[in-house]
Design a protein with these regions (language model features):
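Conserved nucleotide-binding/hydrolysis micro-motifs of P-loop NTPases
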Residues: 64-67, 88-91, 115-117, 144-148, ...
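The Walker A/P-loop phosphate-binding site
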Residues: 1-79, 91-102
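Short, solvent-exposed amphipathic alpha-helical segments in soluble enzyme
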Residues: 75-77, 126, 155
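Phosphate-binding/switch region of NTP-binding enzymes
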Residues: 129, 136-179
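Phosphate-binding/switch loop-helix module in NTP-utilizing enzymes
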Residues: 87-139
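Structural motif
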Residues: 61-63, 85, 141
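Short, well-ordered secondary-structure micro-motifs
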Residues: 70-71, 95, 121, 149-152
Length: 179
């Protein structure tokens, strides 16, 4: 008998939910790895908008400072309801994110390009522990060039995004999990 599936939040995208066997897993990070300019931030913001419509409070840390409320709104998010974490805080930004998860203020944390913070991997450990002990979600965008970077948080679901396959008729070849 297979182990029971952890709770998940449907994304609202049928093929994506089928691929994830029900939706985004609670208490776990999902890393989207793809080349720069491939649409991973747009995809993650649209997934966040779907979660927001289902009642989750969204916190967003755009480490490179490139995300604007206008862009978030264009992807379906209500920017006035988003908890924006200032990347200029550096390591303190991770502490803010960790507290939002630990105190159940946010049900979804989006980390856009967290490598741009320039922090060592061990700085992400408290955030990883807070996520594991909650039912929150964490969506992470990271670049993928000729290598796959080491995970930032413990036990993430890592997905490679293949932009050249997005035009596929069923859309299923656009994502591949990393084992």
């Amino acid at each position: 008998m297979p182990p029971p599936r952890p709770p998940c939040h449907p994304t609202g995208f049928r093929h994506f939910d089928e691929f994830l066997e029900g939706g985004l897993p609670c208490g776990r990070a999902v890393e989207f790895l793809a080349p720069p300019g491939s649409g991973k931030t747009t995809l993650v913001l649209r997934l966040a908008a779907a979660c927001q419509r289902h009642g989750l409070r969204v916190a967003l840390l755009a480490a490179d400072g490139s995300l604007t409320p206008a862009y978030a709104k264009a992807q379906g998010l209500d920017p006035a309801a988003v908890l924006w974490i200032d990347p200029a805080l550096g390591e303190r930004a991770l502490s803010v994110a960790q507290r939002l998860l630990a105190e159940q203020v946010a049900g979804l944390l989006v980390l856009d390009a967290p490598d741009a913070l320039g922090l060592p991997r061990h700085a992400f450990r408290p955030l990883s522990r807070a996520l594991a002990s909650s039912q929150a979600l964490c969506l992470i965008t990271r670049p993928r060039a000729s290598f796959t970077p080491a995970p930032l948080l413990r036990n993430p679901l890592r997905l490679l995004l293949y932009p050249e396959a997005i035009e596929a008729s069923n859309g299923r070849r656009a994502l591949r999990p990393i084992k």
